[in-house]
Amino acid sequence: MAQRGVNKVILIGTLGQDPEIRYIPNGGAVGRLSIATNESWRDKQTGQQKEQTEWHKVVLFGKLAEIASEYLRKGSQVYIEGKLKTRKWTDDAGVERYTTEIIVSQGGTMQMIGARRDDSQSSNGWGQSNQPQNHQQYSGGGKPQSNANNEPPMDFDDDIPF
């Protein structure tokens, strides 16, 4: 089946509150995050630095929801890849309501950025694991570059074959 569009959201932001987690009747976990992203600019008329915070509702499912609930806290930085979805419902007063959320399910990603804020543990931010962290650097406009990828540079000094 041909795809007619792309619905992908990428966020790097800060949690505004601890994650909420619920379990639906079939036993699956559903987690909710409130993530803030900030944009700053200089006002051309006044020369003052301005900043605007945008709040995003993120919904996680399954194991990702459980991991977020266990390891993320208010103030944690997180990288999210998901898709936008708008839901519609009727409230108790009979008024139709809408909300737009970022859904992180199959094909989505949730990754902690930085260390865990709990100073009582000397772990690397993911529980008791002593495995080295493989953080990725994100440069504006480029693809993620891994620190663990120590391949030598490609040597293209050969003559062009035509």
UniProtKB/Swiss-Prot annotation:
Alphabetical keyword list: DNA damage, DNA repair, DNA replication, DNA-binding
Signal peptide (from-to): none
InterPro entries per UniProt: NA-bd_OB-fold (IPR012340), Primosome_PriB/ssb (IPR000424), ssDNA-bd (IPR011344)
GO biological process: DNA repair; DNA replication
Biased composition (Low complexity): 121-134
Domain SSB: 6-111
Name of the featured protein: Single-stranded DNA-binding protein
Provenance organism: Escherichia phage P1
